[in-house]
Protein backbone atom coordinates (compact mmCIF):
# COMPACT_ATOMS: atom_id res chain seq x y z
CA UNK A 1 0.00 0.00 0.00
CA UNK A 2 2.79 2.36 0.97
CA UNK A 3 4.56 1.56 -2.29
CA UNK A 4 1.48 2.53 -4.34
CA UNK A 5 1.11 5.74 -2.36
CA UNK A 6 4.70 6.74 -3.12
CA UNK A 7 4.16 5.88 -6.77
CA UNK A 8 1.02 8.03 -6.87
CA UNK A 9 2.86 10.97 -5.33
CA UNK A 10 5.63 10.54 -7.89
CA UNK A 11 3.22 10.60 -10.82
CA UNK A 12 1.33 13.60 -9.43
CA UNK A 13 4.63 15.45 -9.06
CA UNK A 14 5.63 14.46 -12.58
CA UNK A 15 2.32 15.73 -13.97
CA UNK A 16 2.79 19.04 -12.13
CA UNK A 17 6.27 19.46 -13.64
CA UNK A 18 4.97 18.62 -17.11
CA UNK A 19 2.07 21.06 -16.72
CA UNK A 20 4.37 23.86 -15.56
CA UNK A 21 6.77 23.17 -18.44
CA UNK A 22 3.97 23.26 -21.03
CA UNK A 23 2.53 26.44 -19.50
CA UNK A 24 5.94 28.10 -19.56
CA UNK A 25 6.51 27.16 -23.21
CA UNK A 26 3.08 28.39 -24.27
CA UNK A 27 3.49 31.68 -22.43
CA UNK A 28 7.15 32.32 -23.19
CA UNK A 29 7.69 35.78 -24.58
CA UNK A 30 9.09 35.98 -28.09
CA UNK A 31 9.94 38.80 -30.47
CA UNK A 32 9.91 38.11 -34.21
CA UNK A 33 12.83 38.70 -36.53
CA UNK A 34 11.31 40.80 -39.30
CA UNK A 35 12.50 40.31 -42.87
CA UNK A 36 11.53 41.87 -46.23
CA UNK A 37 9.27 38.87 -46.84
CA UNK A 38 7.20 39.81 -43.78
CA UNK A 39 6.61 43.43 -44.77
CA UNK A 40 4.07 44.96 -47.14
CA UNK A 41 5.75 44.75 -50.59
CA UNK A 42 4.96 48.45 -51.11
CA UNK A 43 7.45 49.23 -48.34
CA UNK A 44 10.21 46.98 -49.66
CA UNK A 45 12.66 47.74 -52.44
CA UNK A 46 12.39 45.10 -55.16
CA UNK A 47 16.11 44.35 -54.79
CA UNK A 48 15.60 42.92 -51.30
CA UNK A 49 12.07 41.49 -51.43
CA UNK A 50 13.41 37.94 -51.76
CA UNK A 51 15.62 38.11 -48.68
CA UNK A 52 14.60 36.09 -45.65
CA UNK A 53 16.38 35.67 -42.32
CA UNK A 54 19.69 36.86 -43.74
CA UNK A 55 18.35 40.42 -43.86
CA UNK A 56 20.31 42.86 -41.72
CA UNK A 57 20.84 46.60 -41.69
CA UNK A 58 23.48 47.30 -44.35
CA UNK A 59 26.82 48.92 -43.49
CA UNK A 60 26.57 52.71 -43.34
CA UNK A 61 28.67 55.80 -42.74
CA UNK A 62 27.11 59.17 -41.89
CA UNK A 63 28.07 62.28 -39.91
CA UNK A 64 26.47 63.18 -36.60
CA UNK A 65 25.61 66.45 -34.85
CA UNK A 66 29.17 66.78 -33.58
CA UNK A 67 30.81 66.28 -36.97
CA UNK A 68 31.85 62.75 -36.01
CA UNK A 69 31.71 59.91 -38.51
CA UNK A 70 29.14 57.34 -37.37
CA UNK A 71 29.12 53.86 -38.89
CA UNK A 72 27.33 50.58 -38.31
CA UNK A 73 30.34 49.55 -36.21
CA UNK A 74 29.31 52.13 -33.59
CA UNK A 75 26.06 50.21 -33.22
CA UNK A 76 27.45 46.69 -33.46
CA UNK A 77 26.39 44.65 -30.45
CA UNK A 78 23.90 47.33 -29.41
CA UNK A 79 20.12 47.44 -29.41
CA UNK A 80 19.00 50.59 -31.16
CA UNK A 81 15.97 52.49 -32.38
CA UNK A 82 16.14 54.25 -35.75
CA UNK A 83 13.91 56.81 -37.41
CA UNK A 84 13.87 59.37 -40.24
CA UNK A 85 13.12 63.08 -39.88
CA UNK A 86 14.20 66.59 -40.88
CA UNK A 87 14.63 69.63 -38.67
CA UNK A 88 12.28 71.98 -40.54
CA UNK A 89 9.39 69.52 -40.73
CA UNK A 90 6.21 71.01 -39.29
CA UNK A 91 3.94 67.96 -39.55
CA UNK A 92 4.85 64.70 -37.79
CA UNK A 93 8.52 65.39 -36.96
CA UNK A 94 8.05 67.59 -33.87
CA UNK A 95 5.90 64.94 -32.21
CA UNK A 96 8.26 62.16 -33.29
CA UNK A 97 11.24 64.02 -31.87
CA UNK A 98 9.43 64.76 -28.60
CA UNK A 99 8.64 61.06 -28.33
CA UNK A 100 12.23 60.11 -29.10
CA UNK A 101 13.27 62.44 -26.26
CA UNK A 102 10.76 60.57 -24.07
CA UNK A 103 12.33 57.28 -25.19
CA UNK A 104 15.84 58.63 -24.53
CA UNK A 105 14.82 59.25 -20.92
CA UNK A 106 13.57 55.67 -20.64
CA UNK A 107 16.79 54.09 -21.94
CA UNK A 108 19.45 56.58 -20.83
CA UNK A 109 20.72 54.31 -18.04
CA UNK A 110 20.83 51.19 -20.21
CA UNK A 111 24.32 50.91 -21.74
CA UNK A 112 23.06 48.35 -24.26
CA UNK A 113 20.72 50.78 -26.04
CA UNK A 114 21.23 53.71 -28.43
CA UNK A 115 19.16 55.88 -30.79
CA UNK A 116 19.76 56.88 -34.42
CA UNK A 117 17.85 59.56 -36.35
CA UNK A 118 18.54 60.11 -40.07
CA UNK A 119 17.81 63.42 -41.78
CA UNK A 120 15.96 62.97 -45.08
CA UNK A 121 17.02 66.51 -46.10
CA UNK A 122 20.77 66.16 -45.51
CA UNK A 123 21.73 69.12 -47.68
CA UNK A 124 19.74 71.45 -45.43
CA UNK A 125 20.42 69.59 -42.19
CA UNK A 126 24.13 70.29 -41.91
CA UNK A 127 26.23 69.40 -38.88
CA UNK A 128 25.71 72.93 -37.53
CA UNK A 129 21.94 72.70 -37.96
CA UNK A 130 21.80 69.28 -36.32
CA UNK A 131 23.97 70.48 -33.43
CA UNK A 132 21.63 73.39 -32.72
CA UNK A 133 18.61 71.10 -33.00
CA UNK A 134 20.20 68.54 -30.68
CA UNK A 135 20.87 71.17 -28.02
CA UNK A 136 17.30 72.46 -28.25
CA UNK A 137 15.90 68.96 -27.79
CA UNK A 138 18.23 67.85 -25.02
CA UNK A 139 19.96 65.11 -27.00
CA UNK A 140 22.47 63.07 -24.99
CA UNK A 141 25.38 62.67 -27.41
CA UNK A 142 26.46 59.31 -26.03
CA UNK A 143 22.99 57.84 -26.54
CA UNK A 144 21.55 59.51 -29.63
CA UNK A 145 23.08 60.36 -33.00
CA UNK A 146 21.33 62.70 -35.43
CA UNK A 147 23.00 62.03 -38.76
CA UNK A 148 23.38 63.68 -42.12
CA UNK A 149 25.23 62.54 -45.21
CA UNK A 150 24.82 61.56 -48.83
CA UNK A 151 21.15 61.81 -49.74
CA UNK A 152 21.16 58.77 -52.01
CA UNK A 153 22.76 56.63 -49.31
CA UNK A 154 20.25 57.75 -46.68
CA UNK A 155 17.32 57.05 -48.98
CA UNK A 156 18.81 53.72 -50.00
CA UNK A 157 19.19 52.50 -46.43
CA UNK A 158 15.64 53.67 -45.64
CA UNK A 159 14.21 51.62 -48.51
CA UNK A 160 16.48 48.58 -48.56
CA UNK A 161 17.45 48.12 -44.90
CA UNK A 162 14.88 49.70 -42.59
CA UNK A 163 11.91 49.04 -44.92
CA UNK A 164 10.09 52.20 -43.89
CA UNK A 165 9.03 53.99 -47.10
CA UNK A 166 7.07 53.14 -50.20
CA UNK A 167 8.99 52.43 -53.38
CA UNK A 168 7.91 54.92 -56.02
CA UNK A 169 8.66 55.34 -59.68
CA UNK A 170 12.32 55.19 -60.76
CA UNK A 171 12.40 58.98 -61.17
CA UNK A 172 11.12 59.31 -57.59
CA UNK A 173 13.79 57.08 -56.09
CA UNK A 174 15.35 59.99 -54.20
CA UNK A 175 12.15 61.88 -53.38
CA UNK A 176 11.25 60.08 -50.18
CA UNK A 177 8.47 61.04 -47.81
CA UNK A 178 9.45 59.62 -44.44
CA UNK A 179 7.04 57.75 -42.20
CA UNK A 180 6.32 57.93 -38.47
CA UNK A 181 7.90 54.52 -37.86
CA UNK A 182 10.46 53.86 -35.15
CA UNK A 183 12.45 50.74 -36.03
CA UNK A 184 13.84 48.42 -33.34
CA UNK A 185 17.13 46.78 -34.32
CA UNK A 186 18.80 44.08 -32.24
CA UNK A 187 22.42 43.41 -31.38
CA UNK A 188 22.94 41.51 -34.63
CA UNK A 189 21.54 44.23 -36.88
CA UNK A 190 18.17 42.53 -37.41
CA UNK A 191 14.81 44.30 -37.38
CA UNK A 192 12.68 43.18 -34.44
CA UNK A 193 9.75 45.57 -34.68
CA UNK A 194 8.06 48.66 -36.11
CA UNK A 195 6.38 51.17 -33.79
CA UNK A 196 4.22 54.24 -34.31
CA UNK A 197 6.49 57.11 -33.32
CA UNK A 198 3.48 59.36 -32.72
CA UNK A 199 1.85 57.07 -30.17
CA UNK A 200 3.23 56.56 -26.68
CA UNK A 201 0.53 54.42 -25.10
CA UNK A 202 -2.70 54.50 -27.11
CA UNK A 203 -3.90 51.06 -28.24
CA UNK A 204 -4.40 50.86 -31.99
CA UNK A 205 -5.21 47.53 -33.64
CA UNK A 206 -2.45 46.28 -35.91
CA UNK A 207 0.36 48.50 -34.66
CA UNK A 208 2.67 48.80 -31.68
CA UNK A 209 3.08 51.92 -29.55
CA UNK A 210 6.17 53.30 -27.80
CA UNK A 211 5.32 51.86 -24.40
CA UNK A 212 5.46 48.45 -26.08
CA UNK A 213 8.76 49.48 -27.67
CA UNK A 214 10.25 50.09 -24.21
CA UNK A 215 9.02 46.65 -23.11
CA UNK A 216 10.56 45.02 -26.18
CA UNK A 217 13.86 46.82 -25.58
CA UNK A 218 13.90 45.47 -22.02
CA UNK A 219 13.15 41.99 -23.35
CA UNK A 220 16.11 42.11 -25.76
CA UNK A 221 18.35 43.55 -23.05
CA UNK A 222 17.55 40.68 -20.71
CA UNK A 223 18.21 38.09 -23.41
CA UNK A 224 21.68 39.42 -24.19
Please give the residue ranges for each predicted region.
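Structural microenvironment flanking redox-active thiols in thiol-disulfide oxidoreductases
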Residues: 97-157
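Periplasmic c-type cytochrome electron-transfer domains
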Residues: 31-40, 48, 145-152, 179-181, ...
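Hydrophobic beta-strand positions
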Residues: 61-62, 184
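Short active-site neighborhood of thiol/selenol oxidoreductases, capturing the structured segment around
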Residues: 70-100, 115-116
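Short, small/polar residue-rich loop motifs at catalytic or cofactor-binding pockets
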Residues: 55-57, 78-79, 177-179
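N-terminal targeting signals for export/organelle localization
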Residues: 1-57, 224
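Structural micro-motif
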Residues: 144, 155, 161-167, 177-183
Amino acid sequence: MFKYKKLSIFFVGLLVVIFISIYTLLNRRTLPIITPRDVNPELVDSLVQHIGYKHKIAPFAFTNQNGKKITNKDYYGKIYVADFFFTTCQTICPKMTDNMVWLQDKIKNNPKVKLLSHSVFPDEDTVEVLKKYAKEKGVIDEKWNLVTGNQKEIYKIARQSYLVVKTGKPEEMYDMVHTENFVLVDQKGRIRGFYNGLNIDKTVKGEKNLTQLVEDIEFLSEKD
